Amino acid sequence: MARVTDKITHLIELVIKDMCYELVGIEYVASGKHSILRVFIDTDKKGVGVNDCEKVSRQLSSIFDVEEPISGQYTLEVSSPGIERPLFHKEHYQRFLGANVKLRMVRPIDGRRNFFGVIGCVNEADNTFELVGELDLVILDIDLIEKANLVVDF
């Protein structure tokens, strides 16, 4: 799956940037005959609305019709990251330092795959960050995270 998302990221990153949006990240869910491609966009101006998503979706659909980065049928979903924003890159962890996050690792660490805590210090050199939980502090490798989302504290 990483190859598919890498290929798509390379294909659309500049297009989205030229449209004055930030490509937050991509999720590709292969599901039998029909897959889902989720593209998360943002902007630092006013946030992302339905019209923004529609505009980007049309542009990406045109590109995908020509380039065909995904074989078989798929649904393209373009959306804002929302308040429980997904985290994809090291820069996201740096940007949301001190925020609550829930995440799932690719493989267990000390018998656990699911973690919840506060994003602590990010170490750029080895691509890790500290996750401060209620009872412990864990150092996690960003490359080994399957899925991570901010958690809103009301």
From Swiss-Prot:
Main location: cytoplasm
BP GO annotations: ribosomal small subunit assembly; translation
A GO-annotated cellular component: cytosol
One family name in Pfam for this protein: DUF150_C
Cited Gene3D superfamilies: Ribosome maturation factor RimP, C-terminal domain, RimP-like superfamily, N-terminal
Subcellular location: Cytoplasm
InterPro entries xref list: Ribosome_maturation_RimP, RimP_C, RimP_C_sf, RimP_N, RimP_N_sf
Keywords: Cytoplasm, Ribosome biogenesis
Biological function: Required for maturation of 30S ribosomal subunits.
Family statement: Belongs to the RimP family.
HAMAP family in UniProt: RimP (MF_01077)
PANTHER family cross-referenced by the UniProt entry: RIBOSOME MATURATION FACTOR RIMP
Protein name according to UniProt: Ribosome maturation factor RimP
UniProt organism field: Ruthia magnifica subsp. Calyptogena magnifica
